[in-house]
């Protein structure tokens, strides 16, 4: 379908930068979620790609075609970008049936498209179906009520779905009354003759597109009733709402209304489908069901999906790529598990994961064998072993070079014509350290930091309190959910959150020995917030 590329895209209002110098590529057939806290710029980014918001500067291309370029003065209107938009509010017409809601946009399409011999196409399809009357009879027999009477409405819907035809063709097919055992060989012959007569009048190809001098003839035209109906039936089958075509939105549940909105968006066959928190109005159970539906929809349509959400669970379960933003700046663009297991910085580690990651401040220095000796949690000793060979002095040297390059790039940008200083300044993420006597982290001034100041990121699932460890902890709180329990443990004044799988019950105040398992403990640079590496942590 479509590949989307954003190059140095910026959107600002005055000095406030909603999106700041964003560059990213959304590959064809990708499912990308724009994730981040409220006000981070994700909806603004979506609206700029769709053409509903004009960027301040930058370049956007869809399928290699520029739709916005500030330097060349290009700004293609939203209705010409061939994209679909699904909103949080379903925006269904209350006075229209489901069928009318889906077909409304199709009836307004007027563009250049091939001329088609619809009479020949429908006649050929009918002849093909009538050559096997026993199959039609079998389909019709399934539509009898308990009294043995044939239900015409049900029969027509069944014929539409079985043979992928429009309601108009289905009505003609039903009119032959094959259930009465009629011989339709003469009708088949007449239909085939009709097709040949149309071909002689003006030749057409296998798709019944009219030919002129061997080329497909085109014209600026609207869609016919037949084409509209086929599109409506196609998308209704995809989202499974064929049985609701004659109902009004008020007669549908929230999930059914959402399916109608999705069908309406898919009907014009957009090259890209944009979704702005479409599931936020649904209850938790229905939201989970619709996630599965969106996954299936992405596979069946083969379209490029761009999905905005602040719910990291939705992003993790739906996306092939996550675009994580904060304060208008791209923090990380990677696959969901990559963001979870190898977050780029403290913000990414904190935002993705439920329960949230544990942050532990530490002082550390690297020994000659490569491991890092740490002092943490008010004097406890630990050893961190990197998953790959690491030389901390070299890492800090590269960090300083990159930060200097960023500063020079920002300085050069500030010297450009039209540059406006950013009021919402970018700052290193202020992580939260959970304590028994919790207090606002903002009231403490940040101390002078050195390269020995580090932060450990410990996911709840790697905390173990069921085996042998070296550090005593106390159960501060426990929330069993059946298959697992979320616990808070206290070490001195510090609190750590863990997830223990199984049906073990924990008593508040009970003592346990804490251990850290696995090799996914993260080591961050405290001054820049960047992740240095991952590895194992041994508490001594």
Question: Model regions: which residues?
Answer:
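Conserved ABC transporter NBD signature motif
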Residues: 58-70, 119-124, 128-131
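Internal alpha/beta loop-helix hairpins
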Residues: 304, 309-422
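The feature captures the beta-strand-to-loop junction immediately N-terminal to the Walker
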Residues: 35-37
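ABC ATPase nucleotide-binding domains
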Residues: 100-104, 108, 206-207, 215-347
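Non-catalytic connector elements of ABC transporters
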Residues: 368-540
């Amino acid at each position: 379908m479509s590949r989307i590329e954003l190059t140095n895209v910026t959107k600002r209002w005055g000095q406030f930068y909603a999106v700041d110098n964003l560059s990213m590529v959304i590959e064809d057939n990708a499912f990308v979620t724009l994730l981040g806290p409220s006000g981070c710029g994700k909806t603004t980014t979506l609206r700029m790609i769709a053409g509903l918001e004009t960027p301040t500067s930058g370049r956007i291309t869809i399928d290699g075609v520029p739709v916005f370029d500030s330097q060349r003065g290009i700004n293609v209107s939203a209705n010409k970008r061939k994209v679909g938009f699904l909103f949080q509010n379903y925006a269904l017409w209350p006075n229209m049936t489901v069928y009318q809601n889906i077909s409304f946009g199709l009836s307004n399409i007027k563009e250049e498209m091939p001329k088609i011999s619809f009479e020949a196409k429908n006649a050929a399809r009918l002849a093909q179906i009538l050559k096997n009357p026993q199959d039609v009879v079998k389909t019709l027999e399934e539509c009898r009520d308990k009294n043995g009477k044939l239900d015409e409405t049900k029969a027509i819907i069944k014929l539409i779905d079985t043979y992928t035809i429009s309601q108009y063709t289905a009505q003609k097919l039903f009119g032959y009354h094959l259930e009465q055992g009629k011989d339709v060989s003469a009708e088949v012959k007449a239909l085939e003759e009709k097709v040949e007569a149309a071909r002689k009048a003006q030749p057409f190809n296998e798709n019944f597109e009219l030919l002129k001098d061997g080329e497909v003839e085109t014209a600026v035209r609207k869609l016919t009733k037949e084409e509209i109906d086929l599109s409506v039936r196609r998308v209704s089958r995809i989202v499974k709402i064929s049985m609701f075509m004659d109902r009004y939105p008020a007669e549908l549940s929230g999930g059914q209304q959402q399916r109608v909105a999705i069908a309406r968006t898919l009907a014009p066959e957009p090259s890209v489908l944009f979704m702005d928190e479409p599931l936020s109005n649904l209850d938790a159970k229905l939201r989970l069901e619709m996630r599965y539906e969106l996954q299936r929809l992405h596979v069946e349509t083969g379209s490029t999906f761009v999905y905005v959400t602040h719910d990291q669970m939705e992003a993790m379960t739906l996306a092939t790529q996550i675009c994580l933003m904060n304060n208008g700046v791209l923090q990380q663009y990677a696959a969901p598990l990559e963001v979870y297991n190898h977050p780029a910085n403290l913000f990414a580690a904190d935002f993705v994961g439920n329960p949230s990651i544990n942050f532990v401040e530490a002082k550390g220095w690297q020994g000659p064998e490569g491991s890092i000796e740490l002092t943490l949690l008010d004097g406890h000793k630990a050893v961190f072993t990197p998953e790959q060979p690491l030389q901390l002095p070299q890492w800090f040297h590269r960090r300083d070079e990159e930060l200097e390059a960023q500063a020079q790039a920002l300085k050069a940008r500030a010297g450009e014509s039209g540059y406006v200083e950013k009021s919402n300044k970018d700052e290193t993420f202020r992580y939260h350290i959970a304590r028994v006597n919790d207090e606002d982290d903002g009231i403490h001034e940040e101390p002078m930091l050195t390269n020995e100041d580090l932060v450990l990121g410990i996911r709840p699932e790697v905390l173990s309190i069921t085996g042998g460890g070296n550090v005593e902890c106390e159960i501060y709180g426990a929330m069993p959910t059946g298959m697992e329990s979320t616990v808070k443990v206290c070490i001195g004044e510090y609190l750590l959150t863990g997830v223990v799988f199984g049906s073990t019950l924990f008593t508040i105040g009970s003592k346990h020995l804490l251990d850290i398992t696995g090799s996914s403990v993260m080591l961050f640079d405290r001054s820049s917030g960047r992740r240095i590496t991952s590895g194992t942590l041994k508490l001594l």
